[in-house]
């Protein structure tokens, strides 16, 4: 399909939306929640609307969601859920639009992640306020804080393995496994937009501790699985494991909150998130370690 964009005739290639080439893709449950976005991207493609503007719009939807949760208006949970889903949907339009246009950037990458962080903090505070206000039990602040920390750690867990995989496949180059500021980043900032570096520093401040914790957990698991350094690529290229942990992504977390908000079961959502979803993720890690050790033992026996 041919469009006129900025005075030039350009073709729309839906395949460019994907983060991974066909042969490297795996089943990602998150794609079920926003499958309609390809049509929205197609509509936006020839317009002057930018991916970063979509990110800002997703921020507005997220702020509206948090506001509705604590507003006390009739059907507050329903409206909170509606705007939260709008945030989720738009959050997956901006990146796809950037990839289709070939305008991905480090600025957009950090803006998107920092928007996710801010909205997540506010929404979880709002949900906790609702529980405390409706029950009169301040103990729910502990449950809300545990839910927030769990949400961040599960999402970082998924992203850690996803970026390790995509970096080896050779796609999704705007993300790095370690986003710590390097000498190269400082040098690049001198001749480019300084906001790239500013957002990167802020990103490291809010996400760095999560990345370090997941990195240490992964190192422990590799030791338990007896993975030598020269076989790390195989460890991070397990598509079945990536498919299995995809429900831990922030997107699915938000969809769960949307569903339980519509059901009026915010407490149950937090309990399931903290208990079941953590056990689910740890169970998959245990399975990965056990499978790896079993396969290595088979190879030893064959020799």
Spans of features found by a protein language model:
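Select subsegments of transmembrane alpha-helices in polytopic membrane proteins
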Residues: 51-56, 112-120, 241-251
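C-terminal membrane-associated helical module and adjoining short loops/tails
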Residues: 2-36, 163-303
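Structural signal for membrane-spanning alpha-helices in multi-pass inner-membrane proteins
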Residues: 66-70, 123, 127, 261, ...
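Transmembrane helix interruption/hinge and helix-loop junction motifs
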Residues: 70-77, 135-138, 262-271
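Alpha-helical transmembrane segments
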Residues: 128, 133-134, 138-165
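Juxtamembrane helix-capping/reentrant segments at transmembrane boundaries
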Residues: 98, 102-115, 176-177, 301-303
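Membrane-embedded alpha-helical segments that form the functional core of polytopic membrane enzymes
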Residues: 51-107, 124, 141-150
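Alpha-helical transmembrane segments of multipass membrane proteins
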Residues: 43, 63-67, 257-259
């Amino acid at each position: 399909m041919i469009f006129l964009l900025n005075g030039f005739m350009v073709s729309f290639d839906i395949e460019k939306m994907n983060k991974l080439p066909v042969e490297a893709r795996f089943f990602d449950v998150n794609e079920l929640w926003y499958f309609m976005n390809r049509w929205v991207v197609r509509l936006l493609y020839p317009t002057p609307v930018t991916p970063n503007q979509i990110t800002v719009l997703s921020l507005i939807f997220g702020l509206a969601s948090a506001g509705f949760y604590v507003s006390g208006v009739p059907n507050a949970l329903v409206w909170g859920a509606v705007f939260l889903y709008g945030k989720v949907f738009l959050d997956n339009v901006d990146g796809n639009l950037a990839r289709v246009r070939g305008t991905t950037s480090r600025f957009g990458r950090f803006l998107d992640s920092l928007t996710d962080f801010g909205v997540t903090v506010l929404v979880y505070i709002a949900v906790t306020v609702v529980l405390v206000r409706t029950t009169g039990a301040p103990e729910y602040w502990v449950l809300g804080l545990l839910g927030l920390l769990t949400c961040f750690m599960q999402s970082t867990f998924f992203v850690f393995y996803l970026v390790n995989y995509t970096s080896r496949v050779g796609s999704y180059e705007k993300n790095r496994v370690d986003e710590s500021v390097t000498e190269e980043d400082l040098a690049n900032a001198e001749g480019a937009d300084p906001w790239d570096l500013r957002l990167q520093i802020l990103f490291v401040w809010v996400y760095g501790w999560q990345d370090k914790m997941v990195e240490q957990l992964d190192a422990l698991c590799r030791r338990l699985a007896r993975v030598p350094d020269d076989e790390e690529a195989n460890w991070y290229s397990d598509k079945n494991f990536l498919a299995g942990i995809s429900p831990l992504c922030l997107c699915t977390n938000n969809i769960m909150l949307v569903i339980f908000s519509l059901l009026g079961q915010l407490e149950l959502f937090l309990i399931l998130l903290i208990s079941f979803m953590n056990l689910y993720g740890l169970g998959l890690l245990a399975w990965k370690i056990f499978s790896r050790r079993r396969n290595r033992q088979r190879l030893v026996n064959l020799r």
